[in-house]
Amino acid sequence: MPSTTRTSNSQNEIVMRLSGSDRVLVIMAKAPRPGAVKTRLTPNLSPEAVTAFYCCLLDDTLALARSLETAGVEVAIMCPGSDVNELARLAGTQLLGKAASVVAQKGEGLAAGLTSVFAHFAEAHRTNAHRTNAHRRRIIAFNSDSPHLPRSVLEDAFETLAAHDVVVGPTHDGGYYLVGAKASHPTLFAGDGMGTSSAMERLLSRARALELSVGFADRFYDIDTADDLSRLAEELRLAPARAPRTAAWLKEWESTAH
């Protein structure tokens, strides 16, 4: 059972103590503020509409993550320090009473956030200096805009990570929607290229330089552009249960846009 929520004096971390599972799914998120999230959608949607849409994505992503808890996977959120309190409040209905945490990243940007994920969750689990590779904690960082991803893909990614140093879920645009590791590798996300069409290739190049074995999850897509939005709307029209809150928002958006 998790202990009572603790808030640090610096407000950098709000934590419900982890139970020690060997698998953690960490959602990379931001507080939903106009102009701060999914900005590439603003030519087609107002900043306020984008923010409302992002809230739906985040809610459904948390629900997807929570569905893995029955299999012993812990759920956490990594975010900028200024967003911790707001995300903890918004995620309260999803995380209340569960073994989960909302943790502030160290530094700015996605690369710093990903580095923080593995530094925080791998180091927190290092209770035995002689822990074997097979029993090291498997940590996967997952974006907050692919709530329609089949749960089986996440389950398979954890299995793939058991046999490799790193697991990557490629996107169709050259990036990646998830990345996992069993240890902290500070240079794995160093340099530029995050959020670009060369992001995955740069990651693989750094993994090779570190002599890390890499396994792959299924290729998928996240929601960055108007085309992605239309594709998602079409898929959820046929299967709204995959991301119900997002599906409802898209249905209303389509009815007012046409």
Residue ranges of each PLM-predicted region?
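N-terminal nucleotide-binding beta1-loop-alpha1 segment
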Residues: 2, 14-41
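Short glycine-enriched loops at secondary-structure junctions
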Residues: 28-33, 79-83, 172-174
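A short, N-terminal amphipathic alpha-helix
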Residues: 54-71
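Short beta-strand/loop segment that forms part of the nucleotide-sugar
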Residues: 71-81
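Short phosphate-binding loop-to-helix
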Residues: 88-137
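Short beta-strand-to-loop acidic/aromatic patch adjacent to the donor-nucleotide binding site
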Residues: 136-144
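Conserved donor-nucleotide/metal-binding helix-loop-beta segment in metal-dependent transferases, i.e.
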Residues: 149-173
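Conserved alpha/beta core of the MobA/IspD/sugar-nucleotide pyrophosphorylase nucleotidyltransferase superfamily
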Residues: 197, 201, 205-258
